[in-house]
Amino acid sequence: MLSEIVTYLKSANGSNPNPATLDAATLLSMYDNSYTGWSDTNLIDNGKQLKSKTALNDAGIQAMFEGWMNDAATASPDLTGSYLQAATGIEWTQMIEKGLMGACFASQMTSNYLAGISTDDNTVAVDPAAGKYYTEMEHHWDEAYGYFTDAPDYPTNGTNRFWGKYANKSYLEDNIGSATDISLAFRTGRAAISAGDTDAALVQVGILETEVKQMVAGMALH
């Protein structure tokens, strides 16, 4: 979803041959997934959305992003520069993309899924009749990993978007080992959960919380 939102926002950049005029209603509907024009048709009416996942469903933070989307639409198209910007220099695409990477993806990863691991059940399969042989804890761990990357063999693959992409950038991987350390912690924790060792998994939760904070801070400083 965020990939298509970003593509739509960038269509208003002045560097394009024919910069588009953004429609605020379209951006807002993409955010809450009432939108039906997705290029990826699997996103249509799939019951998932970015808005409800933003900052643990904080209405104030959601309103902030919606305000940026309205402002981006009002400012479009940008015919004076390469990027869609406010008079103060704020680049709307970056504010929305990077903001949601933090308020949605990083938040869901750490403050939602990993934060609940200690109380998750790890003894009963979720729904064997439906082919869901994993436990609640295994499922939530995998959900957290999915907010980092969708590639099981990261960082061999899965370095093309969002946190999986930025963690593997030289300024993060070479300096603080973000891609390697986060990948290792996720794998180590998942193995511990499958082995029934919750205490060992919680050690990896602590490592991941620290590593994600460092990754976000390092990206912001860069």
What are the residue ranges of the model-derived segments?
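Mature extracytoplasmic or organellar-lumen-exposed domains after removal of signal/transit peptides
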Residues: 1-222
